Amino acid sequence: MTIEKEIEGLIHKTNKDLLNENANKDSRVFPTQRDLMAGIVSKHIAKNMVPSFIMKAHESGIIHVHDIDYSPALPFTNCCLVDLKGMLENGFKLGNAQIETPKSIGVATAIMAQITAQVASHQYGGTTFANVDKVLSPYVKRTYAKHIEDAEKWQIADALNYAQSKTEKDVYDAFQAYEYEVNTLFSSNGQTPFVTITFGTGTDWTERMIQKAILKNRIKGLGRDGITPIFPKLVMFVEEGVNLYKDDPNYDIKQLALECASKRMYPDIISAKNNKAITGSSVPVSPMGCRSFLSVWKDSTGNEILDGRNNLGVVTLNLPRIALDSYIGTQFNEQKFVELFNERMDLCFEALMCRISSLKGVKATVAPILYQEGAFGVRLKPDDDIIELFKNGRSSVSLGYIGIHELNILVGRDIGREILTKMNAHLKQWTERTGFAFSLYSTPAENLCYRFCKLDTEKYGSVKDVTDKGWYTNSFHVSVEENITPFEKISREAPYHFIATGGHISYVELPDMKNNLKGLEAVWDYAAQHLDYFGVNMPVDKCFTCGSTHEMTPTENGFVCSICGETDPKKMNTIRRTCGYLGNPNERGFNLGKNKEIMHRVKHQ
């Protein structure tokens, strides 16, 4: 398709694949349309920058070069862990303003909102603020000290309780303001920032206060109708001795988190024990965006560094296509499969190195917030080369994959763990050869679940239980149609967390658990013992016509209230997990394949 035809499809709203490509982008509004138009141009520029054999593989569905609407036309990077602590402690310049260390929690979260918008506008992937309970604790203490000072100045009786009460209100208000800021602003990418905040390991009174404020705000919801916010994504660490069991000091906060999850789906949880075992870190590692994980890395002085690090991009390998291409007549040929697998791994390496090469010679001045003002943990000079920051394992670059479920069907046996182990062996060789940290990433595949399946259908027709569904299964996940218990699903997916260490998440589908928090806790605890990163999908919908909070029924034409039959999308709030993030399909539609996949999800019970 020519660039003119693609732009016409955007302007006249006839290109549904483009308009519904990203569930977080409202393609009806000017900023998003402008970003989509720029993306069309960037894709055409990429055709002249990326070697033709890579572009051909991308366009035919053998591989997928992610975010080609941003990179390599411009030297964007993917997702990151923002060094919020360093930025707040050392100050930084934002636009025309010199930001100093905040003196209160309200100012600290206001600055965090501005950092969120700036970072999201200078990269194409997700933004994470890790361990905000610990990082923002000093600003709660400053707020408390100010209230003590006021109480003494005005001779307020019971100064300690006064200061405690005022501080608690200030912390709550600070995170309420942050949540509203995030959900009302647009980045230059034409979307709400993909932002994640993690918490849960702090046990002092200020850290506990922050955790409670985050959860209570999420439980309350947004606006008059108390709708479920999409962002920030909430991720809570669970750990024995901190919050996992009844005798732990933060067990009460875990109970609040369970209530929150039952009403808002978030927080997702990370098992601190398994996370440290997987990443090699001495402290739990937060996901960059929805699921990308860094491994341990030490600076020149031997200190472990997490905040300020990032990912350089993803290329995803179409595993079902390798199997489909390995059939000779009606028989699967193992030797041909091995040959094609190795060829396509080499292809992925070239595609990833092409992405890295696009960053060579680029100066820090292209993204001051990232490279000069501390978001990436450094203060480079404007003319410094950014590529040096990414070498020797400081940044990751990821190889993704999709369709283990379909691959197993085509091969005729459970080959998933075997194939991922072989992929890891290749990645290790690439890392040793180049000095860049290649990681194995379980691709979310919000749009790719449909794109790959559609292209494979065009080539091979309708293949039973593979292409006939209209979507490919997300990474290593069990088929969404398989009727098993949540514990069985966790057990079957858990081994993949320890293989695909560069990115993974598992989730289960449960019925309404608001009145069964003990049951929800049992699922959480089982997940915490067996895998790393986990979420639960539960009904959190709301019909504004009848007031029902039952799950809206998905159909090919939209959602229907199961109580009153309402179909007007403006009269209901529907929330679904698209892949790692939540989305509102009535506000920002899913692609055809993802919509079909959601319709076929069964409850695990």
UniProtKB/Swiss-Prot annotation:
Activity regulation, short description: Activated under anaerobic conditions by NrdG, a tightly associated activase. Activation involves the formation of a glycyl radical at Gly-580.
Modified residues annotated as Glycine radical in this record: 580
Residues the record lists as binding dCTP 2: 100, 103, 114, 146
Organism, as annotated: Enterobacteria phage T4 (Bacteriophage T4)
Protein's recorded name: Anaerobic ribonucleoside-triphosphate reductase
Binding site for Zn(2+): 543, 546, 561, 564
Keyword flag Metal-binding: yes
A Pfam match: NRDD
